[in-house]
Amino acid sequence: MEWTQALIPIVSSCAMTIAAMPLFIGYFQMKKQGQAIREEGPKWHNVKAGTPTMGGLVFLVAAILTGIWVGRPWQNQSTPTLFILLFVLALYGVIGFLDDFIKIFKKRNMGLNSKQKLLGQIIGGIIFYLVYRSEGYPGTLNFFGIELPLGLFYGVFAIFWLVGFSNAVNLTDGIDGLVAGLGTISFATYGIIAWHQQQYDVLVICLSVLGGLLGFFAYNRKPAKIFMGDVGSLALGGLLAAISIMLNQEWTLLLVGLIYVMETASVMLQVTSFKLTGKRIFKMSPIHHHFGMCGWSEWKIDIIFWLVSIVTSLITLWFIW
């Protein structure tokens, strides 16, 4: 794929997102529906109450339509990879959509309970793995260049990977523009890896999501006019995990997605510390809230986290090359 061809899915998905988002925002404003702020959240988030959410639905639809259009499966120009990744994007998006819908329109602030959400994510991971193996893809784990034949245990790993990173991105989505920027960097990185491996279906999906995120960022940067919601964050995390598996570069997500890992680790450490000692390690978790309570502005947190992500992504590409 030439660089000029690579612009097609980016521009297409970005344009659809930019064009549709004002209508989506207008609908929420007309219905007077928006984000509810949890009482245990940061106090400065109270000003965000009522901001439209579920914006991830717009860029997901744009990315899926673009992926189908550019991939042209009806002309037999695509491989099963295209369908598998579109399936993951759609399924985890549906789980997030149900969670958001219950929060906003059913006025139940917690949305799906943790067991319901986890069950949906696990089922999604199981279906992904079964389809993945049925198409003859290898069940070996690439651990920093070392191929580990895990057999059936690779299925357990794949499910854990999708569930873990879908939740990790969801935890990271806590301030204006953060995940939109991180996602742009992550999908650009995997797009480069896919191009290097000549996995063009993966490249098409990466570029389609990248374009959607660029269009979404125009409305999600501080002060955000709309949030992506769980429909966006769960889908992005699940897709990143699936892409790393399809490229047989699972380990790279630990570097490319280092911020997501840090955010999740901060929550786990905070909960463990409080249960064992009654003391908190951070002022608030996930860790972006800790920095916020230390006086950092949202823009400062965004920029520093983006820079860290760029550096770790470049290190990843250096390792692969």
From Swiss-Prot:
Catalyzes the initial step of the lipid cycle reactions in the biosynthesis of the cell wall peptidoglycan: transfers peptidoglycan precursor phospho-MurNAc-pentapeptide from UDP-MurNAc-pentapeptide onto the lipid carrier undecaprenyl phosphate, yielding undecaprenyl-pyrophosphoryl-MurNAc-pentapeptide, known as lipid I. GO terms for biological process: cell division; cell wall organization; peptidoglycan biosynthetic process; regulation of cell shape. The keyword Cell division applies. Keywords: Cell cycle, Cell division, Cell membrane, Cell shape, Cell wall biogenesis/degradation, Magnesium, Membrane, Metal-binding, Peptidoglycan synthesis, Transferase, Transmembrane, Transmembrane helix. Its cofactor is Mg(2+). InterPro entries: Glycosyl_transferase_4 (IPR000715), PNAcMuramoyl-5peptid_Trfase (IPR003524), PNAcMuramoyl-5peptid_Trfase_CS (IPR018480). This is Phospho-N-acetylmuramoyl-pentapeptide-transferase. It comes from Enterococcus hirae. Pfam families: Glycos_transf_4, MraY_sig1. Belongs to the glycosyltransferase 4 family. MraY subfamily. GO terms for cellular component: plasma membrane. Its main location: membrane. The keyword Transmembrane helix applies. It catalyses: UDP-N-acetyl-alpha-D-muramoyl-L-alanyl-gamma-D-glutamyl-L-lysyl-D-alanyl-D-alanine + di-trans,octa-cis-undecaprenyl phosphate = Mur2Ac(oyl-L-Ala-gamma-D-Glu-L-Lys-D-Ala-D-Ala)-di-trans,octa-cis-undecaprenyl diphosphate + UMP. GO terms for molecular function: metal ion binding; phospho-N-acetylmuramoyl-pentapeptide-transferase activity. It is found in: Cell membrane. Its EC number is 2.7.8.13. Pathway: Cell wall biogenesis; peptidoglycan biosynthesis.
